[in-house]
Amino acid sequence: MDFGLQPPEITSGEMYLGPGAGPMLAAAVAWDGLAAELQSMAASYASIVEGMASESWLGPSSAGMAAAAAPYVTWMSGTSAQAKAAADQARAAVVAYETAFAAVVPPPQIAANRSQLISLVATNIFGQNTAAIAATEAEYGEMWAQDTMAMFGYASSSATASRLTPFTAPPQTTNPSGLAGQAAATGQATALASGTNAVTTALSSAAAQFPFDIIPTLLQGLATLSTQYTQLMGQLINAIFGPTGATTYQNVFVTAANVTKFSTWANDAMSAPNLGMTEFKVFWQPPPAPEIPKSSLGAGLGLRSGLSAGLAHAASAGLGQANLVGDLSVPPSWASATPAVRLVANTLPATSLAAAPATQIPANLLGQMALGSMTGGALGAAAPAIYTGSGARARANGGTPSAEPVKLEAVIAQLQKQPDAVRHWNVDKADLDGLLDRLSKQPGIHAVHVSNGDKPKVALPDTQLGSH
């Protein structure tokens, strides 16, 4: 628009008669509010999507949801920034308008100039107002130029302020083919409903054609057949067993059927004795068992009565049979040359150990747990044989036992007759096993003297005797 062709009265009049900067200020406030709302929605939307995708909802569906929602969050953030820019441009337009409004000549001033010109022209009879008229016209020209410059500046500023970035539509966050799929599913459901209705109609038609009135007739016929069968069987039994055969058969059958009902009154009759037996098992406490003498616990061990309280002789001799100690065969005639000589062999102490102290029988003797705890008890059991040797001495028990044990004094007497046949060895207890291993590979009769520390100490013949 060429503002130079428009007189200042019109230009200034339009600026003063227009709505002013109020609408632009309202637009700026509205754009600011829209920008803030979009920014808040974008932040809230992003927070909700992130919380669901990282905490409460995991998996491929969650990832797909987050991927679909991310473009919408980006769009809201971008649109919020554009709205903020529009608000700033609206405020810039307000500034441009106020600048142009202040720059244009006020309409009353232009009207006064025009009134003065008319008055000067009317009174210029002799040309005396020519200079005043020229000055008034010059002033008017300046007003024209001033309005023209103000409007050109305003047009340029308002054009820049009103140049906005075009807004874009929100992205599509759903599957475009979803509506088509929904329509197809709806069509299938409708077709299925139609098929179901058709099947229901067909079944109803078939049911209407079925002759349900024959069912009572069939039931009545079955009842008549059952009655006739019962009468026929009664007549047959009476014909075979006499006039009262059917009645007797019925009584026997009823009695047999009622046998199973006897358990009810039998249980009622036995409830009182059962109650007494239960109380007896719970509260009856038998007297404690008498203490078993320890001397009788050694019976059956095959030991002499004089050795029942101590260590029994582990070595014994057999008649007509050599004893085995490891790999050595010991002749039946052996003896101890002197009391200081100790014949070392595998020590097999078998002691009559003291019996376990008699325990009190539990109060509830008839309880299953009490009976189970007595299983495997040691009361009256024979003491187990204790094998203290190792190496060659532990193999002394592997020989064939003697057919009949003999007294140890007889064996010692036989050994005393051949004292030179015995080879004597002195050894400490620590080297005893090694010596016995070496002697097991040498033939002959060996007597090993075991010493305790610096002072040799030979055991008596009746404590631990053996051959090697």
From Swiss-Prot:
Gene Ontology BP annotations: intracellular magnesium ion homeostasis; magnesium ion transmembrane transport; response to host immune response
Protein name in the entry: Uncharacterized PPE family protein PPE33
Effect of loss of the gene: Cell envelope-associated glycolipid phthiocerol dimycocerosate (PDIM)-positive mutants with simultaneous deletion of PPE31/PPE32/PPE33 genes have a growth defect in Mg(2+) restricted media, particularly at mildly acidic pH, but the PDIM-negative mutants grow normally.
Database matches in Pfam families: PPE, PPE-SVP
Domain of life of the native organism: Bacteria
Species classification: Bacteria, Bacillati, Actinomycetota, Actinomycetes, Mycobacteriales
Family: Belongs to the mycobacterial PPE family.
Sequence segments annotated as region (Disordered): 447-468
